[in-house]
Amino acid sequence: QPVLAKLKEYIEEHGLLKSFDYLHPTLVGSKDAVEDLLDFRVKNGEIRDKGQARKSIAGSAFSLLIKYVFLKLKESGDIPRNIFITSNPKKHPLIEKMVTIYVGDDTQKPDMDIAIYSVIEEKLHRCFILSLKTSLRERAGQTYKWKLLLEIATSDCSVREKYNIRYDNETMPLVGFATVNFYDEINNPQHRGMFQFFDSSFIGKPIKSDFISNLSELPEFVRANLL
């Protein structure tokens, strides 16, 4: 509730679409209210590890804020009606099939927090999976390594044959990354190089960059690539 209340302030000031670019200040600005809520839960015995709960709230809030703004844009007609979003893509059977890569007898699946997908004639048409990270210190590398594995699985390179790598789905998902970049790691050259593996990357801050898009550009990317 404190996080959503703060987001609504930015929606009021900048509009629904541009509020995507203020998810970082939304999370930072609601920090004190979240701390008060955590103190209350610790006092009531609902949680024991305040630090772990804080990390969990930040991660889940980032996902829920994206989903909230996206659905509000769809409600207003800015997102086509046959495009959907899920914050539980691992439980979606059609998406699960689309993201499964076989390496010998084993399977490899990406780290994905959100999936945005289109449906045409009651069938899954295109899909864009997003890995969300509040910080690049987290598991961003896991996602781009899976994307690289997908490229190998769908190419004619000798590595594919050597390790018996295969991908059985006709349509490949698009793979993206979104961050609020709490610690400004995107300026690290090592992290910058990682972004080239993604079909698109987004940041929830009102900044301009030549290698990562503003999160407010997500709806246009979806319209251009999923229909």
Q: What are the roles of these predicted feature ranges?
A:
Residues 1-81:
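Interdomain/boundary linker segments immediately adjacent to catalytic/signaling cores
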Residues 71, 78-89, 215-227:
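Intrinsically disordered, low-complexity Ser/Thr/Pro/Gly-rich regulatory segments
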Residues 74-106:
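A short acidic/basic microdomain associated with nuclease active sites
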Residues 75-81, 152-157, 171, 195-204:
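Structural alpha-beta junctions
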Residues 109-118:
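Short acidic loop-to-beta-strand element that houses the catalytic metal-binding Asp/Glu
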